[in-house]
Design a protein with these regions (language model features):
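Active-site segments that bind and position negatively charged phosphate/pyrophosphate groups
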Residues: 81-202
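C-terminal charged capping/lid subdomain of soluble metabolic enzymes
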Residues: 192-266
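Intrinsically disordered or highly flexible coil/loop and linker segments, enriched in small
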Residues: 75, 79, 108, 112, ...
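A short secondary-structure junction motif
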Residues: 69, 73-77, 106, 129, ...
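A glycine/threonine-rich phosphate-anchoring loop and its flanking beta-alpha core
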Residues: 2-95
Length: 266
C-alpha cells in the first residue's frame, strides 16, 4: 500500500505507467494478467537515458504502441461506456499520429544516442499516453462481474499470445514487433483495408513486419494462434460474435497481402 515511483530506462512498452502486469509461464507462453490496486504515483522519464537505450527495444515499443488506438476503438465498439472507459477511448485516438509523425526520425536519433524532440514525443506516447489509456480501459475482478470491462487490447495482442506458443517466434522476436503484425491482422478482420495499407507503409518504413515469415511463423501455425486467442480475456470483447475461423482467415489474408505489398517494393 506504499506509494511507489517508476523510472523507465526503456521505451519498449507502457508497463511503467500502468496498473497491469503480464504473467508468463516458465516456457515463455502467456499465462494471465495481474491487476494492481493503482499505477505508480509518478513516472520519471529521462530522454537522454531513453536515447541511449537499445534501438531494437525502442523500435519494438513503437510496434506495441501502434496497437493501442486500433485495439481500444475496436474493442469499445457498440459498448455502452461510462465516463472512465470513454475517456480512455478518446485518449487512445492520440496514440497513432505521433508514431507516424516522429517514429522514423526518433529511431535514427536512438541509433545515434541523440536526445531529441523526436525521442521525447515517442517516449511520451509509448509510456504515458498508452499507459493512461490502459488504466482507463481496464476494470477487472469487481464484486459484480457485470462491472468488469477490458478494452485495453484486442486482436493484435491475441496474435502475440498465440505466437508465444512457438519458440521459434517468441525467442527471436520482440513483443511489440509481433504485435505490430497483429495490428494488420486486426485491420483485416475489421475490413479496414485502406488503413491497413497505411500501416503496411509505416511498418515497412521502419522495418516492422508485414508477413508471418518475418516473425518466423508459417501458415500451418495460424490455427493454433487463433485457438490460443480464443482463450484470453480480449476475445470476449471482440465486437459481434468472434470467430476463430474468421480470425484464421484474417491472419492468412494479411500475410498474403503483406507478401504482395513487399513484392511491389523490390
Amino acid at each position: 500500500d506504499k506509494p511507489f515511483f517508476t523510472f523507465p530506462t526503456l521505451a519498449s512498452n507502457c508497463a511503467s505507467c500502468t496498473a497491469i502486469s503480464v504473467i508468463y509461464n516458465a516456457d515463455g507462453t502467456f499465462k494471465e494478467y495481474a491487476y494492481l490496486k493503482a499505477p505508480a504515483l509518478h513516472t520519471f522519464i529521462n530522454t537522454k537515458i531513453i536515447a541511449e537505450s537499445p534501438e531494437k527495444l525502442f523500435w519494438a515499443g513503437i510496434g506495441d504502441a501502434l496497437s493501442k488506438e486500433y485495439e481500444v476503438v475496436f474493442a469499445c465498439r457498440d459498448k455502452g461506456m461510462t465516463h472512465t472507459p470513454l475517456l480512455g477511448r478518446v485518449l487512445a485516438e492520440a496514440c497513432t499520429k505521433p508514431l507516424v509523425s516522429y517514429g522514423k526520425k526518433a529511431l535514427e536519433d536512438c541509433r545515434n544516442n541523440v536526445s531529441s524532440k523526436n525521442i521525447e514525443q515517442i517516449a511520451l506516447d509509448i509510456i504515458i499516453t498508452t499507459g493512461l489509456v490502459s488504466n482507463f480501459t481496464v476494470h477487472q475482478n469487481n464484486p459484480d462481474p457485470k462491472d468488469d470491462y477490458y478494452y485495453n487490447s484486442s486482436l493484435a495482442h491475441c496474435v502475440y499470445y498465440g505466437a508465444s506458443l512457438f519458440p521459434k517466434c517468441e525467442h527471436d522476436h520482440l513483443h511489440g514487433e509481433i504485435v505490430s503484425f497483429g495490428v494488420l491482422c486486426l485491420l483485416t478482420y475489421d475490413e479496414q483495408f485502406e488503413e491497413r495499407q497505411r500501416i503496411f507503409e509505416f511498418n515497412h518504413s521502419i522495418g516492422l513486419p508485414c508477413t508471418l515469415g518475418e516473425i518466423a511463423l508459417t501458415e500451418e501455425d495460424v490455427p493454433a494462434i487463433a485457438h490460443k486467442a480464443a482463450s484470453v480475456v480480449e476475445w470476449t470483447y471482440v465486437p459481434g460474435e468472434p470467430s476463430e475461423e474468421k480470425f484464421i482467415k484474417a491472419i492468412l489474408d494479411t500475410d498474403k497481402a503483406g507478401k504482395e505489398f513487399l513484392a511491389k517494393r523490390i
